Amino acid sequence: MGENMTFNVHLKAVIGALTGLIFGSQLAYGQGPEDRMVYFGETHLHTVLSFDAYIFGNRNGPDEAYRYAKGEAISHPAGFEMKLDRPLDFQAVTDHAIYLGMLPAMHDPKMEASKHPISLELRKAKTPSDRLLGFQKIFALLQPGVEDDLLDMEIVKSTWSNIIESAHKHYEPGKFTTFIAYEYTSGPENQNLHRNVFFRGDKAPEVPFSRMVSSNPEDLWDWMDENRAAGMDSLAIPHNSNGSNGQMFKTETFNGQPFDAAYVTQRIRNEPIVEVTQVKGDSETHPILSPNDEWADFETMPYRIGSWDPSNVQGSYVREAYLNGLMLEKEGIENPFKFGLIGASDTHVGAGAFTEGNYWSKVGVIDANGKLRGSVPLDKPREDGSLYSDNNFQTWSASGLAAIWAEENTREALFDAMRRKETYATTGPRIKLRFFASADYDASMINSPDLSKQAYAKGVTMGSDLMLKDGQVPKFILWAIRDPYSSTLQRLQVVKGWVDASGKAKETVYDVACAGGVGVDLKTNRCPENNATVDLKTCKSSAPTGENELKVMWEDPSYNADEKAFYYVRVLENPTCRWSTWDAIRAGVAPRKDIASTIQERAYSSPIWIN
């Protein structure tokens, strides 16, 4: 074993021991909140049972997906091996409810569906272009008002039953958690309004609610409420607001009506968290919305889902939604946008690609290598002279993961944590992150061996409201530990949003802890540059400073008790190579100049709202 490998193994052992001490140990459900552990997992994944995944060559089913999450190797549709560097703690299979299980049936000569003309065409599809054409023909059947003589609800019902059975088979309480789950795929005019629906327990309705019933998410919530009344609790997680064309977080109902209290209550009850990062880009914010945030232009995917149509920025990003929620409160309307954050992959090959250096993208044989996904030049230019494939796969990301603080690794504990929004998102690395707030914290706590216990006892954690009395000022505790398999930490940041006395929404970003032990410049609220660099010929990183742990107690220097505000944490790693640069290096070509060569992996906490 070489010196670097020895160091890395030692580092992982040290960080593992440190993590156990400061982030709690696995104890029985029902003990104090300070005993909660952070669990990392996948909340958005497709198998052979999703119509698009099947068309794109995926033949991995739920069983294979769960085995992958537990650390086993499975095969990519292009034939190579996919394997995690370490197992996940939990996973949900979220196949599309629409046309659930239909594509395997259409390819089975024993099934009546195989005799349909579209089935015959799909069986002949071999090339990526053939498969995309087949996808378009199926997708055309999914539009409102289109007569569909192919869909067989008995197939949907039996497939759903098999998904539930697989989730039960792979559930190992305390070790590995599965959820009964699926994806609801509303998308009028390619405006993404998709949600993943999770059930708390071991029972679910006979058939999942799909866009074939309604494209209005409010009808989905009604269905969820009905099931909850019948003893089947669930929650929905919206995703890819960045591709919603402003529809996900618009400040009116689906049908254009003003919000009322009943709408807000129902939305929050059914959608407590939002997926902020995944393969189809990042939805935290956008440089148009946050021009003074130097890190806002991160993994920006500018299109509506499945098209080249631009997605309207307003109404499509979570930070703006948080601000709009405060604006609604200012107007006397309840806030429908008090949601927490989570990350996921949205893989369509049954296995999430969470690391830049081992990225296999999303849609099977359609984007299985650098040439297909636009990171490596084609063998010869296209007719228009372009050197790269005619798609927007180069805007996709090696992201993300869900992180949940829970008492134990069970369905009930993880679900309840999602319900209370004690969750955060990462773009892939397993960064451990805590965030607390209180008016009663004192400086001596920060180095206390029972910091977590005191922080919970005296305050609130991510996803919560902090209610203050007159004259009180909030103090915040931020605490991050690096993933030993990833880069070191560069900085801890607080993102603040508020509405001022004139009714104008405002935001700012504070650096609050810096690598190298240096202080924040109080004039700019920024850490000094640590001059971290990446060699684009080898992807070797060089950082004069970088931390395994960053921890700080912080007070807002501009706090105004008359202004409602939200705060959330963003932690940034030192720069590393983006997946597209890794593709180029392995192909022996220069990285593409019109896309980022490096990225800064990050984590986003759920906010704390100050009232």
Give a label for each model feature.
Residues 12-26:
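Bacterial N-terminal signal peptides
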Residues 3-15:
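Bacterial N-terminal signal peptides that target proteins for export
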Residues 198-200:
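Long, charge-dense tracts
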Residues 208-209:
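Long, hydrophobic alpha-helical transmembrane bundles and adjoining juxtamembrane helices/loops
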Residues 115-146:
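Aromatic- and acidic-residue-enriched carbohydrate-binding clefts of CAZyme catalytic domains
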Residues 203, 213-218:
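Conserved, charged catalytic cores of large soluble enzymes
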Residues 29-62, 66, 73-117, 121, ...:
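C-terminal functional module detector
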